[in-house]
């Protein structure tokens, strides 16, 4: 053991440091008024720039959409016109077939027909059939000179028998 006596407890010297409940806080910075105004103006400028960019993007998208809609409307109108013309052509063909136009003359007859609806096309077909005289008539049988004169005597090419035949046909005595 040691020669010196020690007292029980804490050794003599520094007392225990005092513990505080608050941690060390940094000291708050203080900004002057001009610096704060500058920061606010920068933030406002950024907000305005973003707002302008969004408005420009929306306007560009709307313009593109409007152009696309206009192109579609134009194409739809063109298709409707083509469909209308095809319907008129079909109606003319049906009217021609109903009028019993011969198949080799149907397309020529369709070109003659006028009108935009079924009634006007039918009326045009009726008028044109009356003008043409219809297609139901059969052709007149042709004269075949090789078949003779039906029992009559052949006329000489010169002389009085020709004159007499002409007088008989014309009724001159």
Swiss-Prot record:
Native source species: Mycobacterium phage D29 (Mycobacteriophage D29)
UniProt-recorded name of the protein: Probable capsid assembly scaffolding protein
Segments for region (Disordered): 1-30
Family, per entry: Belongs to the L5likevirus scaffolding protein family.
Keywords, sorted A to Z: Coiled coil, Viral capsid assembly, Viral release from host cell
Chain's role: Scaffolding protein involved in the icosahedric procapsid assembly. Coassembles with the capsid proteins to form the procapsid, in which the scaffolding protein is found within the external shell of icosahedrally arranged capsid protein subunits.
Residue ranges of coiled coil: 36-56
Keyword Coiled coil: yes
Keyword Coiled coil belongs to the record: yes
């Amino acid at each position: 053991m040691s020669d010196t006596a020690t007292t029980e407890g804490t050794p003599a010297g520094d007392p225990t440091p005092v513990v505080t409940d608050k941690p060390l806080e940094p000291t708050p910075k203080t900004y002057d008024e001009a610096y704060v105004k500058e920061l606010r103006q920068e933030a406002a400028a950024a907000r305005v720039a973003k707002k302008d960019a969004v408005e420009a993007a929306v306007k560009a998208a709307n313009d593109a959409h409007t152009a696309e809609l206009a192109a579609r409307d134009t194409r739809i109108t063109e298709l409707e016109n083509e469909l209308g013309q095809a319907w008129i052509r079909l109606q003319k063909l049906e009217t021609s077939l109903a009028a019993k136009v011969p198949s080799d003359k149907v397309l020529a007859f369709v070109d003659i027909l006028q009108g935009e609806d079924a009634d006007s096309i039918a009326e045009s077909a009726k008028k044109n059939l009356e003008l043409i005289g219809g297609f139901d008539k059969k052709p007149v049988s042709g004269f075949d000179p090789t078949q003779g004169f039906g029992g009559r005597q052949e006329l000489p090419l010169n002389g009085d028998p020709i004159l007499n035949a002409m007088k008989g046909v014309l009724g001159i005595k």
